[in-house]
Amino acid sequence: HNELPFLYGGDNWPYDAMCERQRRKGVYASQYLTPDRTARQMAALAVRYFDNDSRVVDACCGTGQLTRALILEGVHPSAILGFDTDAELVDLYARFYSEAAALRMQFREIDFRCENVIANPPFEIAECVSFLQWLSCTQHSGDRAVLLLPYGFIDKPCPKSVQETMRHFIVRHRTPMQEPFARTNCRAEIVVVERA
């Protein structure tokens, strides 16, 4: 819209601005920002694996990097609901994607069925396990999720809660993330799971 007070040559200002914020303040609350190519790959998998008649939930949505990719893949914004705990990010999300529903909530507070989930959830072990436990409670058999998880997380033997939770899911697809996160050295993989 040419409304920035400086010359910007990129095509994804929200992502670039959040990367700059991380550069200045560091990673906060396990917010590893989903890079463009990874977001597009996840969105393509979502379109391939999801039930097209059901809403898509962008869990831990941040500024909407995954929602942006879903829209580019042809998902209508009105079919998307994004939520995050960070009020500033949810406000930005609501401004960028006014046709999508936006909620400021923790995933633990979401108690409705989420048939189709796309997410880059928190990477700390306890938080990631909690996210997967929440997912197993809000999904029914056959529901699916496309997740960006720490590399090898779903194979971890310890803590036991990882394998106990993963028993609720069938892994349909997994592939290593092909590009690095900005400002972090964490490795990740894209995992498509189906609720057993």
Predicted regions located by residue number:
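Class I S-adenosyl-L-methionine-dependent methyltransferase catalytic core
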Residues: 1-196
